[in-house]
Amino acid sequence: MATFSIRRYSRQGLWSLFLTCAFPLHFWTLILVFRDISWLTERTNAWDAIGVASYGMIFAFAESVVVFLVTALLGFLTPKQWEPERRIAFLGLLILITSVWGMIAQLLFLWNIFLPAQAIQFLRSSSHPLRIIYAACLVVVTPTVLLPIYAFIRSNKAIMFMQNLMERLSLLTMFYLFFDLLGLIIVITRNIG
């Protein structure tokens, strides 16, 4: 079993994959924290706002671990002949694409962007509104997923680009992990005191 997983992944590759999984979750958590910190401070005080931010960072770390484990397991579905570096870059690409769509979905909710009234009326009058919604989502999402994957599979430049991007994001993510540690210390301090 150990030799099987070593052929699929290297230790450095798994660390790089974890950092890639952690980056979008921490980035988005920090954006939401900075968005909400002012009204939290006004509502309570700065120490409570820092506590809420700390819980957010700890939760982002826990999410990162879960996403990493699922992604690493999905890596076993990739072609066996791929080198570990290529597999890690491919999985990183999938994580980043999925994360961008997750952020877009949450932004639409946060900005209160809904379907226009005409579209809602059309969906009400149709016999299968969910099918229409799913088809529309499929038309929008599919190219944004398949085109980068196709470019990745066909082009060595895309593979190199993804590997370089993951390497650059790794340094920033290490900084985010430091914030996780600070958040854990703050949460422990707040709960003890």
Q: For the regions a protein language model found, what residue spans apply to each?
A:
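Membrane-interface helix-boundary motifs at transmembrane edges
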Residues: 7-10, 78-89, 156-166
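Final/C-terminal transmembrane alpha-helix of multipass membrane proteins
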Residues: 165-191
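Alpha-helical transmembrane segments of multi-pass membrane proteins
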Residues: 22-39, 184-186
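Hydrophobic alpha-helical membrane-insertion segments
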Residues: 17-28, 91-106, 177-178
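Membrane-interface interhelical loops and short amphipathic "cap" helices
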Residues: 37-56, 112-129, 187-193
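Hydrophobic cores of alpha-helical transmembrane segments in multi-pass inner/ER membrane proteins
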Residues: 24, 59-75, 134-152
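N-terminal membrane topogenic signal
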Residues: 3-21, 164-171
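Membrane-proximal helix-loop-helix units in multi-pass membrane proteins
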Residues: 81-142
